[in-house]
């Protein structure tokens, strides 16, 4: 609802757009959304300020404000009720008096809010007391929490996934490439088959689901829109919208309930001209493929150069590099013997030079080879060690997941090896 409202406002006015939400005392929306997922979506939509209103009093809002300030780079709004509603002699009243309200709002400004006001139960006396209590705190240029937050986050309606720390898994199975059954399911409009693939990947440990429904002679925009809507009804995992069809991309981004990953843009000017306006309008974390008009560079340095070109062009649209993840691409070693070495070196250089997150379609490395899982799983470990933020993999592959859980345990991403023991403790 708030995404629809923000888009409606932005499409019909050039005025600043603010958005506030009602959270409960656990920091959740009534529909289950949490603070990072809300902030990620609203900042992706480029609201001018965001925050909290209604639902509770100023004291109860402070922990939620503190959490918002961990994620938000735009100014934060706080508009509490005059405490909590109570009844006396059949009449409803609020339990925070004006002077107390003013003291709480002064503390809220000190914590980092930039815009303050009142909601249910507040009166002119409450606002007057708030103004008086905060009269010496009007300079917001050095407001705590106002600094830029360099956090790469994708979200669904109720779950946020942050890239840049523990490696994440992007499930690759909702994609017709090389999958006869999936192709037939698309042709037969078998949506249940697609939903089963989503649920199985979620159960296997995926954090994000890639969604590609591209086939010849299929109305891809209509099908992509339908599949995204249906997936959102059965999984809370964020989605990666994977298409080269710009109409399909916009159809999905417009109705997507959150901040998606977008796969992809590349270094060709035509690609950036088409994709970046959609990222600017709808919000998203876009995958930048390191190829351009000259193809895929043969060297790591060449791919890093294309990555820089993508990052610089994105700036023209106000897209920060925290909303770009780079795919340095991997060529199968069956035809390009140094393909893995080049990819890993490019991966290291991109992470070091630009400080962006990185993804890879890991299984491409073994195309044309026998017993591909052995090559894939070993390369996956090497890529994670080189700085891979998220691998696009098959989470139903025992070899790949064994590599993943082992790596996380070895690198202390798995506290006390709990996940590893949970998976393999009975073996």
Predicted segments — roles?
Residues 1-325, 331-427:
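Domain-level signal for soluble alpha/beta catalytic cores
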């Amino acid at each position: 609802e708030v995404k629809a409202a923000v888009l409606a406002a932005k499409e019909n006015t050039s005025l600043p757009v603010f958005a506030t939400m009602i959270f409960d005392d656990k920091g959740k929306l009534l529909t289950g959304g949490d603070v990072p997922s809300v902030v990620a979506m609203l900042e992706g939509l480029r609201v001018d300020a965001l925050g909290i209103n209604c639902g509770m009093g100023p004291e109860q809002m402070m922990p939620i404000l503190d959490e918002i300030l961990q994620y938000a780079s735009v100014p934060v709004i706080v508009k509490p009720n005059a405490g909590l509603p109570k009844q006396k002699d059949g009449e409803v009243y609020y339990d925070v008096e004006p002077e107390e309200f003013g003291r709480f709002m002064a503390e809220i400004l000190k914590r980092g809010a930039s815009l303050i006001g009142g909601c249910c139960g507040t009166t002119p006396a409450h606002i007057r007391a708030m103004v008086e209590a905060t009269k010496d705190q009007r300079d917001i240029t050095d407001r705590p929490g106002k600094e830029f937050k360099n956090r790469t986050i994708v979200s669904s309606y109720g779950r946020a996934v942050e890239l840049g720390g523990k490696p994440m898994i992007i499930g690759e199975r909702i994609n017709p490439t090389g999958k006869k059954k999936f192709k037939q399911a698309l042709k037969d409009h078998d949506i249940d088959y697609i939903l089963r693939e989503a649920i199985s990947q979620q159960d296997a440990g995926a954090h994000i689901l890639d969604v590609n429904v591209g086939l010849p002679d299929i109305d891809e925009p209509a099908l992509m829109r339908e599949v995204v809507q249906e997936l959102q009804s059965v999984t809370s995992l964020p989605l990666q919208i994977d298409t080269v069809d710009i109409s399909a991309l916009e159809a999905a981004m417009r109705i997507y309930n959150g901040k998606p990953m977008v796969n992809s843009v590349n270094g060709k000017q035509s690609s950036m001209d088409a994709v970046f306006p959609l990222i600017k309008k709808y919000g998203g974390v876009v995958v930048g493929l390191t190829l351009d008009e000259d193809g895929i560079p043969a060297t790591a340095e060449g791919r890093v150069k294309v990555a820089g070109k993508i990052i610089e062009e994105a700036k023209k649209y106000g897209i920060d590099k925290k909303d770009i993840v780079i795919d340095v691409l991997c060529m199968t070693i069956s035809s390009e013997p140094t393909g893995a070495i080049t990819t890993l070196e490019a991966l290291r250089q991109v992470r070091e030079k630009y400080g962006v997150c990185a993804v890879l379609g890991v299984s491409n490395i073994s195309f044309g080879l026998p017993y591909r899982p052995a090559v894939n799983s070993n390369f996956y470990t090497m890529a994670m060690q080189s700085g891979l933020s998220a691998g696009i993999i098959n989470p139903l592959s025992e070899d790949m997941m064994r590599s993943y859980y082992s790596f996380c345990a070895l690198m202390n991403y798995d506290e006390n090896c709990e996940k590893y023991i949970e998976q393999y403790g009975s073996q």
